[in-house]
Amino acid sequence: LKIIGNIYERIKKPFVAFDVDDTLIVPSCATGFAYDTPNIENIALFRTFEAMGCNMVIWSGGGEDYARMWAEKLGLKAIILKKQKNDTIDICFDDCVVDLAKVNFQVKRRKNSISRKKEKVVH
């Protein structure tokens, strides 16, 4: 199997990526709380793929540091990558329609009618 190397590992362990905002967490603007909260259903889905032996990836449009912070807060072990199209990623879960992996799933966004844009503070 060492001759096959990476090909065997890719078949055996697919790469599955999860976005942070509105996928692994629900932003405070959608909950009415003063803080972001874990999205229990999507975290359970993450753990299911993890239990199957997949290579788990967490990424965010907010950057790698933001993704790393949330991975640590949520207790999720994953590879942290820049959020961009990546031929290595087999499956991607995101709240937006994306083309970042071989197969892309759009998860349900809570209270979609509420804008996710941050309000600009005027000083």
Predicted regions span which residues?
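HAD-like aspartate-dependent phosphatase fold
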Residues: L1-H123
